[in-house]
Amino acid sequence: MRIIAPMMMLLILLSPLSGCVGDDSSEELDTVDPIPDLTAPNQHGENVTLSEFRGTMLVILFNAADWCGICNDEANRTEELLQSMGGLDDRYTVSFVELLRDNAEGTTIASQEDAMNWSEYSNNSHSVLHGQATRDYIEETFDREDIPGFPSYLIVDLDGVARSWVVGINEPIVAEDVQVQYDAYLQDLDQN
């Protein structure tokens, strides 16, 4: 009986982390269809549509919120990551969008205020999308692609086709991941 109470307390304390992913996996995709589109407000209240980024290499960060410690860490490195992605290869332009699922406590859908606070806290310049449509998009995408949790990155090519997932933080996404997917995109164009 003495062990049950501490174990229950540990379970309760760790349950908010169940959506976070501590390991890493990367998967290249064999799809040829564009990703489903999403239109949702960003932290400034402006609607952003994912298909507007066609013609660029789009990196989408699927993120939770403050309750996910590794999500905080990832959000804090995105501006530097975006700069390194943009400066690596002049053959393409990189666009970056973050999809924020929850409020800081993980109890409700992320609002504009949550997205603005997240953006300011992380000192980011990219769009942070929020709201019911964003949460639905995250859940549908994770179900369809069997993605285990946050943070997760999706690299999308110039035609709007998903090229690769990078899930977790042990081997986080780097600028060269986008370059590799761009080269694979060019190779696929040559073969068709």
Per-range role (PLM):
Residues P148-N192:
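Thiol-/selenol-based redox modules, centered on thioredoxin-like
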Residues T56-M57, D73-L100:
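Conserved helix-turn-beta segment immediately C-terminal to the redox Cys motif
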Residues L58-F62, S95-L100, S127-G131, S152-I155, ...:
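Structural recognition of the beta-strand scaffold that forms the well-ordered cores
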Residues P34, M57, P148-F150:
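Short, small/polar residue-rich loop motifs at catalytic or cofactor-binding pockets
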Residues V97, Q112-F150:
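Short, internal strand/loop/helix patches
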Residues G55, F62-E80, E105-T107:
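Conserved redox-active cysteine motifs that mediate thiol-disulfide chemistry
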